[in-house]
Amino acid sequence: TYDNRYIETLWWLLKQLYNKNLLYKGYTIQPYSPAAGTGLSSHELNQPGCYRDVKDTTVIGQFKMKNPKPEMAEWGTPYFIAWTTTPWTLPSNVALCVGPKIDYVAVQTYNAYSGEKMTVVLAKPLLNMHFNPKAAELALEDYKPGDKLVPFKVVGEYKGTDLVGMEYEQLLPWVKPVSVDEKGNWTDASAQAFRVIPGDYVTTEDGTGIVHIAPTFGADDAFVAKAAGIPSLYMNNKKGETRPMVDLTGKFYLMEELDENFLATCVNQELYKNYEGRWVKNAYDPQFTVDGKYDEKAAQAAESLDIFICLNMKADNKAFKIEKHVHNYPHCWRTDKPVLYYPLDSWFIRSTAAKDRMIELNKTINWKPESTGTGRFGKWLENLNDWNLSRSRYWGTPLPIWRSEEGEEICIGSVEELYNEIEKSIAAGFMTANPYKEMGFEPGVY
């Protein structure tokens, strides 16, 4: 991309795609590297070594029901319980997702930390993962805080569809989900949030069979939330930008960075002040990068925001279980630091439009070994997503899309075309000089 001839070739290719309606601007949840300051494509994440096993603090959160079924309210406080490997996303929770065909149970028990009586709902196939079968015969009334075995009793069974529509209280009410009208006024949208919604992607392989939904930090979350009419939880900063609770550098917004009207209307400042400015992952904190070198061991040894949130949830009786968990997590190939899934404006090539044709053509290729074509490459084609082209880096090829404030748009396919469009702009009085002409540059002559 340091050669203008190469850049012009890409411009020509992009214009061919644009003319075929295969190039578009979208607002989607994408892999994003706060350390590099740019979005990443699925191809970049699939490079060897990008996915690594990491040990994180996880939590099963307790979401207090608003409208429990009668049998759920007979013993203590009724909760839905949901597991997450990213506790820092819990303040952005706006829904819980269940599998419509999955079997769920209501269980009378105690919170192992606080000793509180409670009734929890989780997937039936995961019951023995979270409750010791030996405790099933114990009397609930005989339990004393600190006992190793916590008694439990199943008092109800349901399909996921039976739970859809049930409501719960916001787990960490730091910020309200909002909608904004044409005049820029913020309106509390909590009435449309904090309910159980269906999702076919929910499994019973791990967790509780109930998925915590934070649409601003997950593509699946955003998809099911949109389908169910669930609002997302956004911040409005002083630049007039609408962003998630986490900024582009990977930290919770400072209150001084937020729009004053939004701050006064939508933020519980007393709760939020304990978390503002905190890095969601230690890897993003500048103190762990000295002279351009990232000290991963020091970052891992320091207390993380996840631990801080989990301990506060435990103290507030909002945590059912806290534990360490090893899982596979994507990292940026440029910085070796973990990525986030983040909503970004980007330009995409509509690769999915040619998906079936590419799968068909792949079958005609004589792969050596054959497993490469049917395996890694074939599976990649089957799970193909539209190609995210946008990168926030100065050394990349500038995308040749020009758009007016009124939404008019043009795609430039060559330097000659750009030269001519500048001449039109000068004639119309929008520009005073053609920088190409002033430099003596002739299109096509390098």
Which residues make up each language-model segment?
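Active-site cores that bind ATP or allylic diphosphates and position pyrophosphate for catalysis
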Residues: 31-81, 88-89
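Alpha-helical scaffold segments in soluble metabolic enzymes
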Residues: 12-16, 60, 64, 308, ...
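Active-site periphery "cap/insert" segments of enzyme catalytic domains
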Residues: 2-16
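Short, solvent-exposed turn/loop segments enriched in Gly/Ser/Thr/Pro and often Arg
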Residues: 1-6, 28-35, 326-330
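Non-cofactor substrate-recognition interfaces
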Residues: 1, 73-80, 87-446
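Gly/Thr-rich phosphate-binding loop signature of adenosyl cofactor/nucleotide-binding cores
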Residues: 21
